[in-house]
Amino acid sequence: MDTPNKDDSIIRFSVSLQQNLLDELDNRIIKNGYSSRSELVRDMIREKLVEDNWAEDNPNDESKIAVLVVIYDHHQRELNQRMIDIQHASGTHVLCTTHIHMDEHNCLETIILQGNSFEIQRLQLEIGGLRGVKFAKLTKASSFEYNE
């Protein structure tokens, strides 16, 4: 018989909330299609842990992962080349890019990045500030372990 992994065990605990906060939690469960309060609370905790992990300013921590979504006018002169130059000059690892044509004027590009939080966020600001970029949103993640 396999011994349960520490990560596999579920611990039950209770939380005290005001009624209006509980009502808001229950509304989000319905709105987002969660099967239980526990599922929503677990996701909220994970999201907060990722947020806190990104807030730790450790230039040697290369465990940050992010996806940068960029929408831009592909008729803007030399914009694509400037975006590529910024990626090459960055201290971040560009793991993958995907480019799609949305319509006759707009392209959407996703850029998957790995590195430290400062370099990733700097790349997002540099690309987002280019003339012709209409949207630049960074979705942050982390590859750190929660059980340490």
Swiss-Prot record:
UniProt cross-references to InterPro entries, sorted A to Z: Acetolactate_synth/TF_NikR_C (IPR027271), ACT-like_dom_sf (IPR045865), Arc_rbn_hlx_hlx (IPR013321), CopG (IPR002145), CopG/NikR_regulator (IPR050192), Ni_resp_reg_NikR (IPR022988), Ribbon_hlx_hlx (IPR010985), TF_NikR_Ni-bd_C (IPR014864)
UniProt xrefs under Pfam families: NikR_C (PF08753), RHH_1 (PF01402)
Gene Ontology biological process terms from the UniProt entry: negative regulation of DNA-templated transcription; regulation of DNA-templated transcription; response to nickel cation
Entry cofactors: Ni(2+)
One MF annotation (Gene Ontology) recorded for this entry: identical protein binding
Known partners and oligomeric status: Homotetramer.
Protein's job: Transcriptional regulator.
Protein name, entry field: Putative nickel-responsive regulator
